[in-house]
Swiss-Prot record:
PTM notes: Ribosomal protein S6 is the major substrate of protein kinases in eukaryote ribosomes.
Family: Belongs to the eukaryotic ribosomal protein eS6 family.
Function of the molecule: Component of the 40S small ribosomal subunit. Plays an important role in controlling cell growth and proliferation through the selective translation of particular classes of mRNA.
Organism of provenance: Nicotiana tabacum
Source superkingdom: Eukaryota
Skewed-composition ranges (Basic and acidic residues): 172-183
Cross-referenced InterPro entries: Ribosomal_eS6, Ribosomal_eS6-like, Ribosomal_eS6_CS
GO CC list: ribonucleoprotein complex; ribosome
Region (Disordered): 172-199
Protein name: Small ribosomal subunit protein eS6
Length: 199
């Protein structure tokens, strides 16, 4: 008594989902884009639409599942629903998502949701892996990565400078050889042309 629920969705007996904004108690076929409710559309092309059967959002007896959310709690507890407290396991796995909860210097691992101990063979606690956690080890790896990159850039620059120097010396040698050969050729031609002039 006193509970207020909000209808969030549901399915009829054939498994067709309810769609918000379709004000009919039956089924309709709508052209839906990928990613819209009632059409996940994996493997579709960009902008492709498909005609899918969806059920209207009006509640009727032909529904098999109705999803509700408690908006306002009533006087008494509902057995199995509001009288038991279930642990919240699905916390944020990325520290960036939960920066409002912690400071950057804090160790986020202390605040991670963990499961309760098992009463069967194995006793312990399970915790989700935190992605992109900034620890001293990750910072050390980042520094090492940056230092390695700088070292590689410096090595590449020095090798490029050496190569340019070698290339310049080779080009200079080629020019000298060519000028020598041209000088020899000219001297031969001039030597060959002198007797003919004298004659």
């Amino acid at each position: 008594k006193g509970y207020v629920f909000k209808i969030m969705g549901g399915c009829d007996k054939q498994g067709f989902p309810m769609k918000q904004g379709v004000l009919t108690p039956g089924r309709v076929r709508l052209l839906l884009y990928r990613g819209t409710p009632c059409f996940r559309g994996y493997g579709r092309r960009n902008g492709e639409r498909r005609r899918k059967s969806v059920r209207g959002c009006i509640v009727s007896p032909d529904l098999s599942v109705l999803n509700l959310v408690i908006v306002k709690k009533g006087e008494n507890d509902l057995p199995g629903l509001t009288d038991t407290e279930k642990p919240r396991m699905r916390g944020p796995r990325e520290p960036q998502r939960s920066e409002a909860l912690y400071f950057k210097e804090d160790d986020v691992r202390k605040y991670v949701n963990t499961t309760a101990e098992f009463t069967t063979k194995w006793k312990g606690s399970k915790a989700p892996k935190i992605q992109r956690l900034v620890t001293p080890l990750t910072l050390q790896r980042k520094r090492a990565r940056i230092a390695d990159k700088k070292k590689r850039i410096a090595k590449a620059k020095s090798e490029a400078a050496e190569y340019q120097k070698l290339l310049a010396s080779r080009l200079k040698e080629q020019r000298e050889k060519r000028s020598e050969s041209l000088a020899k050729k000219r001297s031969r031609l001039s030597a060959a042309s002198k007797p003919s002039i004298a004659a």
